[in-house]
A protein has these predicted regions:
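Gly/Ser/Thr-rich phosphate-binding loop
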Residues: 66, 91-96, 105-173, 183-186
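Conserved S/T- and glycine-rich ATP-binding loop of Class I adenylate-forming
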Residues: 4, 10-13, 46, 52, ...
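Short hydrophobic/charged patches on amphipathic alpha-helices used for structural packing
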Residues: 80-83, 115, 224
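Short beta-strand->loop structural element characteristic of the AMP-binding/adenylate-forming
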Residues: 18-21, 48, 70-76, 151
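Conserved AMP-binding/adenylation subdomain of ANL enzymes
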Residues: 28-45, 53-93, 107-108
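Conserved ATP/PPi-binding loop(s) of AMP-dependent carboxylate-activating enzymes
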Residues: 180-184, 195-226
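Conserved pre-ATP/AMP-binding loop-to-beta segment of ANL
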Residues: 1-9, 16, 39-45, 198
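Conserved AMP-binding A3 loop
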Residues: 5-29
Length: 227
């Protein structure tokens, strides 16, 4: 279970992208994290839009994979394509990036999308992440989709994708924060000396759990800085 399984690359927001070495334990833990957070069953159908080299796409799908649920891959992000896929494939769970949420809402407002033409009653959960999610955007979303559950996900390639921190379905009334430590994760915020910080103090978020990467591949110097 500790054998090497996959290489994913960081986005490079803080420098040159680094290769992240993940183990079979990392990947299997991601399955359990996602399934624990969103309760996928064999009846769920997940719409996967981002490319699979992105851990945020692959690991969200893993929750359905663990439950034996179906996954649908969509090669495009036009609002009409997304809604058609959800309707035609009877998708129940969809993970969206903020720009896609915005584009769908604008298309609805401009009447480029007529929701009455789609079968959407089975769509039980929309969740978002990978960047700050404006609370006003989700409030706007709920105007059109009031019966859906919602979750915000936070993660990084080094934590095998999303879910080390998440808002939680039960906390959807508290939009804005990224949330609390996810299933079998621990987290705290510290200062530059590693001292624990408290409410309304700014610092660095550190996490611990079975999803933490093995290392930056063939990069012991950078690995030592973060592990």
């Amino acid at each position: 279970i500790d054998d090497n399984a996959a290489l994913y690359f960081t986005s490079g927001t803080t420098g040159i992208p680094k290769a992240v070495l993940l183990t079979h334990k990392n990947l299997s833990h991601a399955c359990y994290v996602e399934q624990s957070h969103h309760g996928q069953t064999i009846e769920d159908i997940f719409l996967c839009i981002p490319p699979l080299y992105h851990t945020g796409a692959k690991m969200h799908w893993m929750g359905s994979f663990l439950a034996g649920g179906k996954g649908v891959l969509l090669k495009g992000i036009k609002p009409e394509w997304i809604m058609e896929a959800i309707s035609e494939e009877a998708c129940t769970i969809v993970w969206l990036l903020v720009p896609w949420i915005h584009d769908i809402l604008i298309a609805i407002e401009n009447k480029d999308i007529d929701l009455s033409k789609y079968q959407l009653s089975q769509w039980r959960l929309m969740h978002a992440g990978a960047q700050p999610v404006p609370p006003s955007l989700i409030d706007f979303w709920k105007k059109y989709f009031p019966h859906q559950s919602y979750d915000t996900n936070y993660g990084l390639t080094e934590s095998t994708g999303p879910g080390c921190i998440h808002l939680g379905l039960e906390n959807a009334h508290s939009l804005g924060p990224i949330g609390l430590p996810g299933y079998e994760w621990e987290a705290k915020i510290v200062d530059k000396n590693g001292n624990l910080l408290f409410a309304n103090e700014s610092g660095e978020l550190i996490v611990r759990g079975a999803g933490v990467m093995k290392e930056y591949y063939k990069n012991p110097e950078e690995s030592a800085k973060v592990l």
